[in-house]
Amino acid sequence: MAMRLSSAAVALALLLAATALEDVARGQDTERIEGSAGDVLEDDPVGRLKVYVYELPTKYNKKMVAKDSRCLSHMFAAEIFMHRFLLSSAIRTLNPEEADWFYTPVYTTCDLTPWGHPLPFKSPRIMRSAIQFISSHWPYWNRTDGADHFFVVPHDFGACFHYQEEKAIERGILPLLRRATLVQTFGQKDHVCLKEGSITIPPYAPPQKMKTHLVPPETPRSIFVYFRGLFYDTANDPEGGYYARGARASVWENFKNNPLFDISTDHPPTYYEDMQRSIFCLCPLGWAPWSPRLVEAVVFGCIPVIIADDIVLPFADAIPWDEIGVFVAEDDVPKLDTILTSIPMDVILRKQRLLANPSMKQAMLFPQPAQPGDAFHQILNGLGRKLPHPKSVYLDPGQKVLNWTQGPVGDLKPW
């Protein structure tokens, strides 16, 4: 149930809704992104690159899904749907000699707890095993030590394969992946788990499920600030302060009684509808800086309020996050109400028009079947922009750069 707003907030919300309806009537409810970002967002990768998909034993992919179909619906599912997309994509080549990129379809987030949370502890062994397989059955990995290969690693901290930042930093990126291009949800500047050249993508959010919860476009946005989720993680952070670097706790302590803020740990069945009735949707960091809220906010036209210092956002060369979102430093959370109420109305309305652009929403989704401009195509565009590979990535016969014995002893055990 949405909280009751102050008279000032109600007046602002009604004025925003009225102005938005006038824009619809004038055909001005959406706005195309200007400049190169808009062109990049609408690029077509077909004809720009060719990808060879390795045929691995099904134990690395399909059997995992058959064992636990929950993998298909959690926020890490992009690795599964990317594989399915590539198998029927026009950029796929069956001739590895003409490939620009090589893709290894290994699912590293399908080992789930009874509660549906991925356990990343076997992931390094699964990945090493898959790389050993392709390097012994094809010559292409050995030709570059993986520099013309890409992997989808949608864990909390990417190829560091741990859900807690301290442990992820301690592990670092799996040594065998240090020359490959990583396609990952995790993105934070100057972080050991984000290597140079990685492609940052949105987490998976179920497109069909969201589509069934759409409300009429003329529905007024009568909620000023909206958030549903944890503020404290007492199970993993019993003393508090470490989870979300204290930012979520600060949101709760400062604004739990503020009528402008509809915030709660409850997750109502009207969650998606409520986002469509909201002007601002909080997207604070959790254990990692990203979450599906970012996707949901964009799809539902709710201005994302990004509280995650140094975050690297999905497809940042195509999506103008500064123009569609609001960035609030973690230390500035206590001033969140002042920051948001100080944004001029014309700025809010422009952000809403940009968010209403269908190409913006499409870029954040992994639909089945794929559609032009979706997240699959944005990934391919990112790979295409890296071509041609520099000659320096190709090794002399017998030359090795990677150390196969590097890393924690547990990671070296056969899988």
Swiss-Prot record:
Involved in the synthesis of glucuronoxylan hemicellulose in secondary cell walls. One of its GO terms (biological process) is cell wall organization. It is found in: Golgi apparatus membrane. GO terms for molecular function: glycosyltransferase activity. Glycans are attached at residues 142, 403. The keyword Nucleus does not apply. Residues 1-4 are cytoplasmic. Its EC number is 2.4.-.-. It comes from the Eukaryota. This is Probable glucuronosyltransferase Os01g0926600. InterPro entries: Exostosin (IPR004263), Exostosin_GT47 (IPR040911).
